[in-house]
Amino acid sequence: MNWEFILKYLPMYEKAAWLTLRIGLLGIVFAIIVGFVCSTIQYYKVPVLRQIVAVYIELSRNTPLLVQLFFIYYGLPKMGIQTNAEACGVAGLAFLGGSYMAEAFRSGLEAIEPIQTESAYSLGMNRYQTMRYIILPQAMSISVPAFVANVIFLLKETSVFSAISLMDLMFTAKDLIGLYYKTTESLFLLVVFYLILLLPISILGSLLERRLRYAGFGA
């Protein structure tokens, strides 16, 4: 192990890690928004939109992120829509992640007993109040494990961003291996930085799950 090489290129990996984290978090934020909207449409069985959401989820979950990125990065400019690599990365992650988040949120919503909704309506609550105060708090706490797993999954999926020339962690490792043939050192740094990004999320997710399990409605 060449520690001099590792120390020399540590700042390069740090810069790549910030890029990976920035694009990853932006993509995840949009994925959460898309997922919540889609799960709500499915939960309330909105005509037409429900079918569109179902098609989107199947399309997103059954095609690789790399293919989706290539379509956005190379396909959209052919249709006159100009974009850049970072925007494509965010859009691709949001498109893929939205379907996974939708399924996670939907499972949480469907876990709530219908009697709770009926009881809320009988107390004079409208649909918004029922969702805001009765259904959503329980559904969110139930969805925590799947939500955290999806966040980690999506951050790991950022490793394909190098295919569209984004200088992320994977791009940096491949670049250094190609230039200096320092495979062990380059991959060691890659693993270390992915652990730095992902381990805190995993630990915080476990703590959050224990703290909010069923939001006090169950063990």
Predicted regions and their residues:
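Transmembrane alpha-helices and adjacent helix-loop boundaries
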Residues: M1-A219
